[in-house]
From Swiss-Prot:
The name this protein goes by in its record: Toxin Boma6a
UniProt-listed GO biological process terms: defense response
Keyword vocabulary terms for this entry: Disulfide bond, Ion channel impairing toxin, Neurotoxin, Secreted, Toxin, Voltage-gated sodium channel impairing toxin
Described function: Alpha toxins bind voltage-independently at site-3 of sodium channels (Nav) and inhibit the inactivation of the activated channels, thereby blocking neuronal transmission.
Main location: secreted
CDD domains hit by this protein: neurotoxins_LC_scorpion (cd23106)
Source organism superkingdom: Eukaryota
Length: 66
């Protein structure tokens, strides 16, 4: 497990405005909890605590949305 920005397809973070949205998203993916980190290095994005290793996370590089 690790603490990290949970990622969508193409290395994109989940944008957020509310902690509750991120907490729900993170816990549904097996994390202990989550919150919305405002003004972080990837903008306003969901950060998960104790996220399982099989769940994608944001890695170095750009978001490659099609």
């Amino acid at each position: 497990v690790r603490d990290a920005y949970i990622a969508q397809n193409y290395n994109c973070v989940y944008d957020c405005a509310r902690d509750a949205y991120c907490n729900d998203l993170c816990t549904k993916n097996g994390a202990k909890s989550g919150y919305c980190e405002w003004f972080g290095p990837h903008g306003d994005a969901c950060w998960c605590i104790d996220l399982p290793n099989n769940v994608p996370i944001k890695v170095e590089g750009k978001c490659h949305r099609k």
